[in-house]
Every structure is written in C-alpha cells, then in structure tokens.
Amino acid sequence: MSKLGVLLTICLLLFPLTAVPLDGDQPADRPAERMQDDISSERHPFFDRSKQCCHLPACRFGCTPCCW
C-alpha cells in the first residue's frame, strides 16, 4: 500500500492538478453568454404562435411562457 502512495505522490508532484488548463469556452464558465445563445421561446419548436405560449410538455424543456 505504501508503494501506491509513493507512486501517487510522485505523479501529483510531476503533474499537479492545477497545471491542467481549464477550457474557458465552456458555457458553464460564462453564464451570461450562455443565456444570450439560448434559443428564444418564439423560435422554440413547441411554441404555439396562435396562442403565443408553449404547451405544458414543452415548458418542461425550457419553453416559456406556458399555456396553463
């Protein structure tokens, strides 16, 4: 078991986790841009243009406003 600990310590010293480059283009890192890129409700495939709202099943997938 101590050999495994030594190996793990050596690996962490040679390649620390902070050296891993983070991908700054991921949407989770930029919530404001993610909201701008989000599909608008009027263009949502389940948006009912005649009622100007989304049916209940579509509301579960982020389409708003909902037809109640």
Curated annotation (Swiss-Prot):
InterPro entries: Conotoxin, Conotoxin_a-typ_CS. One of its GO terms (cellular component) is extracellular region. Disulfide bonds join C53-C67, C54-C63, C59-C66. The modification 4-hydroxyproline is found at P65. The keyword Secreted applies. It holds the Pfam family Conotoxin. The cysteine framework is III (CC-C-C-CC). This is Conotoxin Mr3.4.
